[in-house]
Amino acid sequence: MRTYGMSETAGGCVYDGVQLDGVLVRIDDGRVVLGGATLAKGYRNPVEPDPFAEPGWFRTDDIGAVEDSGVLRVLGRVDDAISTGGLTVLPQLVEAALATHPAVADCAVFGVADERLGQRVVAAVVVATGSTTPTLAELRAHVVSALPSTAAPREVHVLDELPRRGIGKVDRRALAARFGG
């Protein structure tokens, strides 16, 4: 079972994409917005912009979609999104596409500064044991088979392992700093 929630919602409020009774979910400009009985009234010392600015609602930093069935899908985080050529690419979706390539054991996608595009999509991959290192063209074609071409990496770096933060999540910022200069 996958739980979605945060301190502002008194913990989990959506389970396997289905909100609990009394919980409201909507998508506003791609962001997940939550409301209902479990929601905090606000912050003691509000930040700007205040995610509680709309009474009864909390604007998260998560990007999501609500399917026709009403199931919430969290697609990524606003701060991870890559703005390339005026379009938004969610690294988690590109990573999911790359992960289906048989030569990719692990991967991370991140944005680096680009004069023309704003940011360009870059991937770091760990090659599966016994596999031949895939080419950039091969990985781009693989991503384009599942996602729009703007999501395909414009460069790929092969690593022995991905850098991780203390909690085990991939450190995209470290990758962007390493390969963005």
Predicted regions and their residues:
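Generic structural signal for residues in well-ordered beta-strands
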Residues: V25, C107-V109, V156
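Flexible lysine-rich "adenylation lid" loop at the C-terminal edge of ANL adenylation domains
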Residues: P153, L159-F179
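Conserved S/T- and glycine-rich ATP-binding loop of Class I adenylate-forming
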Residues: G5, V143, G168
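Conserved AMP-binding/adenylate-forming
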Residues: M1-T3, S7-L72, V78-A81
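AMP-binding/adenylate-forming catalytic core of the ANL superfamily
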Residues: G36, I63-A151, E161, A174
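Conserved beta-strand termini and adjacent loop/short-helix elements that scaffold enzyme active sites
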Residues: T3, D28, F110-V112, L159
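Residue-level detector of flexible, active-site-proximal loop/helix-junction positions
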Residues: S7-A10, T88, P163
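Active-site donor-binding acidic/aromatic loop of nucleotide-activated sugar
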Residues: E54, V158-L159
